[in-house]
Each structure stands twice: as structure tokens, then as C-alpha cells.
Amino acid sequence: MNDIHFLRRLGGIGALGLSCCIVPAGAAGGGFDAANIGAAPAGWTCGSTGGGSPRWTVEADATSGEHAPVLKQSGRGKFPWCVKKDTSLADGWVQVRFKPLSGKEDQAGGLVWRWKNGDNYYVARANALENNVSLYYTEAGSRKTLKYVDAPVAAGSWHTLRVEFVGTRIAVFLDGKRYIDHQDDHISGAGAVGVWTKADSVTAFTDFTYAASAR
């Protein structure tokens, strides 16, 4: 699929890298409800692929922009995830702002899409300890690497991660720059979208948005 066709399928946004951090009209999602401070976000389901004790809570954060609450993962698990229950996208895009706060083993922030359950989904993540962006698929609970690319990921700073996906085409952006453009057919059909971390990563998320592609 060429760039122009990919762009049209996404409704005039994306794969050419011109609008990575712009949220167009019609996008769903947004911030997290202050009524859920100290608790898991309403309308989301959270867990960890491979076990562990993840802790997903909505927290106050004065650095998030307009003092909006953030979703924070402060526990530990092999691959913690938290997905929005009412989402089902086969093709489209998903975007989030994230801040790596701490972690000795990892300082990762990621996105999941075509999420069928805790053992089957795609994930793209950025890691402040490794300074890279990577793309994986998870099947039957086993994570497989598709691509790694070096990228600057400063700890303690906000970054914007975005994934665009149509058919077998996947594009991954960090802070407005496309780092990965890959073809893969392991996981197809509609699934949920959400956020992801790894190991002991303590990570904050805000401005979670998504949309299905134009038909």
C-alpha cells in the first residue's frame, strides 16, 4: 500500500507525518476523570500479560497540561496493560502523551491496538532507558519483536506516541516523527485500544485519543 492510499484510508491524516500530534475532529477519548483519583479509570480494564502486580490509578499531575489527571502505572508486571472497554477498531489510529517517571529495568510507555485479550494484541512502545521505539505483536501470551529503531526518549519529560494501522500497514510516530513503517499480518480484525508498560516502569499517560479510519 503506498503512502497516498494509506493516508486516504486514514481519513486524510497521518502516514506522511504531517499531522502526528494533531487530534482531528471526530476523535474519541481524551483525559481521565478527576472523580477517579486514586482508583482505576472507569470504563477501562487493566491487567498484565505474563503475570505480576500492576497498579493502574488516576492521579493528579500539574505537569500534564491544564492540570489534567493522568493514568499512572506504579506497580510491576511482565507487560502491564490497560485498555478502554468500549473500543473496537480494525483500522485507524491511536495516540497518547506519556511521561517515563522511573524504573531500573525499564522506563517504557506504549500503545496497544487490535487487542483481543491479555494474550493477543499489537504493541508499540518507547523506552527512556534504551532510547528507542519498537513494534511487537503478542500471540498466545508470547511477545515477538517486529522492529526496533533508535530514538531520543528523555526520562521525566512528556512525549507523544502515535500508531496508525490499516490492513497490514503499521506506522509508529514519536513526538511528530515517523520512526517505523512496517507490514505485518499476524493480528487482524477489530480489537480494543489502550496503553502499556513493561516490568518496573513507572509511567504516566494523558490525552489518550483514537479514531477508526475512513471507509
Regions found by a protein language model. Give the residues of each.
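Extracellular carbohydrate-recognition regions
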Residues: 26-49, 206
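Ligand-recognition surfaces built from glycine- and aromatic
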Residues: 31, 187-215
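Secretory/extracellular carbohydrate-interaction modules
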Residues: 73-135, 139
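Short, aromatic/His-centered strand-loop micro-motif at the edge of beta-sheets
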Residues: 139-160
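Short tryptophan-centered beta-strand motifs in secreted/extracellular beta-sheet-rich domains
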Residues: 32, 94-96, 157-172
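Extracellular glycan-recognition surfaces and repeat-rich motifs
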Residues: 39-70, 77-78
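Short, solvent-exposed beta-strand-to-loop segments that form ligand-recognition rims
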Residues: 173-194
